[in-house]
């Protein structure tokens, strides 16, 4: 059973809606690009949180202080964007959700796409006052290696590997299904349409009522994007194996590979 905070009604926000909120300063916009890129230019009123800064946090308490410094309180509406097809932004948004923040979405385009549309950018940094944010860990959206190992015995659990196809063929967690992160996007948007996403799952034989666990190579960026892609079509029970395949290998857990892969295996979406 998922907690209320694991239910996401709108995983992404469109450009028109984001613009209107930015213009009246009713939203906290987080730019997840590198600091030097942010300093050159960014979307109007955005604050900067490079993913590396977030990943350096060694506890939820440390991480929540990063968000407090960005002026994010419990009731702050947050939109996150990047310039890497939504993967880094997804990891930041997921972390906010994990620590208990309920109102966070992804901008449905990248920074480059925003700029190509001729929308407002700036070099000015907003003046932000630190605030307080409560810590309410949401365990229902995270999978550990132990949880994953136990869940694999359940017939209604699906494990999705979001790495590149070749990486999957060489090594993967036994029983996982490969949906490369590149398959999640559509032209001009970081995620497929809902209908297209449902068709993708159907083509892989993945039921929408299953518990789905996503993973990628190391820190949960590519699989974070998959997490929100699944949430976009209303799948209620999705978890991110945040430490992903890197940890799985380090723990010397079982690993599978596909022998004698054909051209189709390599080129499959």
Question: Locations of the language-model features?
Answer:
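Cysteine-dependent PTP/DSP-like catalytic domain, specifically the C-terminal lobe
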Residues: 239-265
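Thiolate-centered catalytic microenvironments shared by cysteine-dependent enzyme domains
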Residues: 2-9, 54-143, 211, 216-245
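Append "and occasionally in soluble cytosolic enzymes with long acidic Gly/Pro-rich linkers
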Residues: 57-67, 193-208
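Flexible, polar/low-complexity N-terminal or interdomain linker segments that lie immediately upstream
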Residues: 1-40, 86, 108-170, 256-269
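A mid-sequence, solvent-exposed acidic-amphipathic segment
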Residues: 151-200
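Acidic/glycine-enriched edge-of-secondary-structure segments
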Residues: 44-58, 180-189
């Amino acid at each position: 059973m998922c907690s209320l905070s694991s239910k996401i009604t709108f995983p992404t926000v469109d450009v028109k809606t984001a613009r209107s909120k930015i213009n009246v300063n009713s939203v906290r916009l987080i730019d997840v690009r590198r600091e030097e890129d942010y300093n050159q230019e960014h979307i109007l009123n955005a604050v900067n949180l490079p993913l590396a800064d977030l990943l350096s946090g060694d506890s939820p308490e440390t991480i929540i202080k990063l968000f407090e410094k960005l002026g994010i309180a419990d009731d702050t509406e947050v939109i996150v964007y990047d310039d890497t097809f939504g993967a880094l932004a997804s990891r930041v948004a997921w972390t906010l959700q994990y620590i208990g923040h309920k109102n966070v979405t992804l901008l449905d385009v990248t920074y480059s796409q925003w700029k190509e549309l001729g929308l407002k950018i700036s070099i000015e940094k907003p003046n932000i006052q630190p605030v307080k944010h409560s810590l309410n860990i949401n365990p229902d959206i995270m999978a550990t290696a132990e949880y994953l190992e136990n869940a694999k015995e359940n017939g209604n659990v699906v494990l999705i590997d979001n790495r590149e196809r070749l990486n999957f063929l060489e090594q993967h967690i036994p029983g996982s299904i490969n949906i490369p992160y590149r398959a999640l996007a559509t032209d001009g948007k970081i995620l497929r349409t809902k209908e297209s996403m449902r068709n993708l799952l159907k083509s892989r034989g993945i039921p929408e009522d299953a518990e789905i666990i996503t993973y990628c190579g190391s820190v949960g960026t590519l699989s974070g994007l998959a997490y929100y892609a699944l949430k976009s079509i209303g799948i209620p029970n999705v978890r991110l194996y945040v430490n992903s395949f890197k940890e799985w290998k380090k723990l010397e857990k079982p690993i599978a590979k596909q022998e004698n892969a054909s051209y189709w295996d390599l080129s499959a979406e």
